[in-house]
């Protein structure tokens, strides 16, 4: 899709997908861009006491409660809390790898035990801050894709091709 936006770059860090999506959701609901850093509260923070990060934002008069979990153990805690109805969120991001893709198995290893995901994530957010485009919806290639093929965001064609449905599977007990 050609040159990307800073919002696309931060997909690799925990909280980045949520932040990028909220930027565009704000635009789609208000017709105006927010401050590019308006949703940075969803970014993962080091040494958090809770297994996930949460925040609430106003989008055109509707409060959106968000949660971001990094690592499958933390995701398990979040999912349990949701199932127990201890918490409620309209929007959840789960990154399987600690720190997001920046901490994933495809990253270089230097032989030390030092975790580099947090440092890599900070670099991604810095790249976003310095990017000429900071919003996914302003990416010219994405705009052309919608204009020439998908019609508009949330159109029937876009929903059909870009979104998926999840269904619970009933599995037989282990034998």
Predicted features along the sequence, with ranges:
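Iron-sulfur (Fe-S) cluster-binding modules
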Residues: 1-175
């Amino acid at each position: 899709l050609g040159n990307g936006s800073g919002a696309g770059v931060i997909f690799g860090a925990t909280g980045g997908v949520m932040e990028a999506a909220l930027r565009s959701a704000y635009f789609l609901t208000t017709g105006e861009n927010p401050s590019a850093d308006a949703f940075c509260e969803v970014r993962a923070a080091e040494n958090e006491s809770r297994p996930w990060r949460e925040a609430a934002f106003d989008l055109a008069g509707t409060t959106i409660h968000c949660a971001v979990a990094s690592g499958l153990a933390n995701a398990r805690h979040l999912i349990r809390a949701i199932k127990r109805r201890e918490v409620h969120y309209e929007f959840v991001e789960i990154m399987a790898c600690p720190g997001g893709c920046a901490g994933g198995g495809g990253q270089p290893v230097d032989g030390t035990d030092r975790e580099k995901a947090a440092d890599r994530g900070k670099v991604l957010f810095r790249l976003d801050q310095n990017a000429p485009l900071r919003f996914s919806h302003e990416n010219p290639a994405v705009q052309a894709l919608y204009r020439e093929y998908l019609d508009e965001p949330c159109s029937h064609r876009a929903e059909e091709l870009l979104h998926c449905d999840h269904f619970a599977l009933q599995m037989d007990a282990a034998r």
